[in-house]
């Protein structure tokens, strides 16, 4: 078996980028939102692993949901209407303060705004999106 490791960026994942891999004279088109794909190459398996290069505060769960941990000062958000969670891909994510609770750690979900879900029947299908889950840590 041959194993190739690719390190896509977060923007690659959110943009549904497909990488063209040239291996032993053959071209393989790798959808970067998959974590592992198997191809046949000259009677052997070619395994392509996608291990994203992510910031420390971001992880990806088994359902391709993005988990983004952010920290905000409780005192600072009292005067704001919304908090900016950052720009991911081409979208900026803003959470209305009115939807937050008075608790130290909470989650806020942007449904169907994340990475493409894995379709085992069509690996290039990018029509269904995962969620982006912000884990908000409030501190003094």
Model-predicted segments: where are they?
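Intrinsically disordered, low-complexity linker/assembly segments
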Residues: 12-140
